[in-house]
Amino acid sequence: MSISWTRNFFERFCVEEYNIDTIKQSSFLSADLLPSLGARINQSTKLRKHIISPFNPRYRAWEMWLVLLVIYSAWICPFQFAFITYKKDAIFIIDNIVNGFFAIDIILTFFVAYLDSHSYLLVDSPKKIAIRYLSTWFAFDVCSTAPFQPLSLLFNYNGSELGFRILSMLRLWRLRRVSSLFARLEKDIRFNYFWIRCTKLISVTLFAIHCAGCFNYLIADRYPNPRKTWIGAVYPNFKEASLWNRYVTALYWSITTLTTTGYGDFHAENPREMLFDIFFMMFNLGLTAYLIGNMTNLVVHWTSRTRTFRDSVRAASEFASRNQLPHDIQDQMLSHICLKFKTEGLKQQETLNNLPKAIRSSIANYLFFPIVHNIYLFQGVSRNFLFQLVSDIDAEYFPPKEDIILQNEAPTDLYILVSGAVDFTVYVDGHDQFQGKAVIGETFGEVGVLYYRPQPFTVRTTELSQILRISRTSLMSAMHAHADDGRVIMNNLFMKLRGQQSIAIDDSNTSGHENRDFKSMGWEEWRDSRKDGYGLDVTNPTSDTALMDAIHKEDTEMVKKILKEQKIERAKVERSSSETAGRSYANDSSKKDPYCSSSNQIIKPCKREEKRVTIHMMSESKNGKLILLPSSIEELLRLASEKFGGCNFTKITNADNAEIDDLDVIWDGDHLYFSSN
């Protein structure tokens, strides 16, 4: 089991998210390759023969192996520089094996494609790869891999030549690989950013302590008078001590100096050590500022959500106390803030808003379509209607005992209960009366939204609930764009309301609180009543209150009386307009009743668009006459007969000689030709 876990752990480092053969990405954050503008997204990137992709998993594994060798080199270089003389031992063999791996990497680099910094495309030309490598890091890589230890033994048998030791320190150049690794891991969302940064900061601190201790010991070891050194003053025969004791003592001095503790047991004794301590303390100032700044930033970022939450709770509590709000409202405020804090990572509405509309629609369709599809209100509607509707759905969480809808509130949204439960209550005589309950999969608020009536109930959650919210604007737009689906929705609502005995509605236009039977007026009446004109506009809460009340009470006589008065006013307006225009047909058309009755005892306006047409006699090539199109074919034939001297016309054709027998096919501005059979 441990072997499998270890393999999976290293695969997270080695496997790159970018698949070069299929251009398939699971995460684009750590991949630097971008397609050029206009490039086909499904076009595979094929490199030349013997050229290796830098995103190849095997090459990533090779880089990870080199990083482990770099960690070894970072520790052994300062340690050998200060404590160990070069000789043919186990460390000598290991160092040369490590150098061999880095020599192989130098050769391998000539066959690895690189990412162009200007075009962000992979360059696989061997010539360009070689020129780029030779002009950048090749010389440093060679110097950091050169076998200076064997050369030191060749020219200096005791292996203590300082020059070769300094040259061996060039192996620290390999640390750039560790820096690149941390830079890549910080952008990789598969790893925790906080712990990656902490690991990097701890590694920098340990390396600084290790190097400072080794360098300070080297100064004491090379000083002519061992007793006048920082370690010789305490241990006069320190050179005879074990390697472990000397190394631990050096680290002790380094870390006490780095942390500015300074116990005083080890301190500089000669000018060389004093000079080194001066530069080391100056370095410590910058390193300490770097560590404190980064750790502070990480901790602040980690605790910012909690701090914001506490500030919000404190502000809400102070606001409630200052304004002496009731305890139930205070509890709702605090519950809402607490729930928002807990579900902040679940909703992520800000993330969705930053995505393109097509992606948001796909996400909404995947999450909400199965839920909306099973709602009674949308049974029988088309898939296109639901797809348009779910794109504008918002999911929200509500804590227990929070009001979602208030009684007599203006209708704004339709709600679908996904989880939890809500109660319906009506405020009567100073008390809330329980009217019903909604469970998972049910809707509420549809009556107020579809009829633009004040909300009949107060809807309050009884437990933690997830609710989908559909705005009235989105629903109305979808219903008008899909008229057949709108008719189905209104019929579904009508069937539900007809099956209920009574629905309590508090009418704000009348006094008292009564329970009334609320019936649907039907889709056709609802749709026509929304048109501009002199009819009832149910979308305007301030329009014709008496007529709305009459329809709501199903008082047919009152509806007829009110509409009769409106018809008289309408006729006066049309007659005045006709006389001013001087139209010959205006007097005839003003006699027509602009209102017609519907099949459900609800009278609605029959609004007719006026069209101007030019009429001609087929047998004469005289100028035509411009008239207003009447309401029937017979009226049009009669009017043409009057205009052309009493001719008995029986046939109407258009400019293309096509016979016309229906006024609906005539457009404004058409030329009509009359003839007799």
From Swiss-Prot:
The organism's place on the tree of life at top rank: Eukaryota
Molecular function terms from GO: identical protein binding; inward rectifier potassium channel activity
Membrane topology: Multi-pass membrane protein
Bilayer-crossing regions: 64-84, 91-111, 135-155, 166-186, 201-221, 273-293
Compartments, record wording: Membrane
Result after altering D265N: Affects the pH-dependence
Stored PROSITE patterns: CNMP_BINDING_3, KHA
Presence of keyword Transmembrane: yes
Subunit: The potassium channel is probably composed of a homo- or heterotetrameric complex of pore-forming subunits. May interact with AKT2 and KAT2. Interacts with SLAC1 and SLAH3.
Protein name as catalogued: Potassium channel KAT1
Annotated source species: Arabidopsis thaliana (Mouse-ear cress)
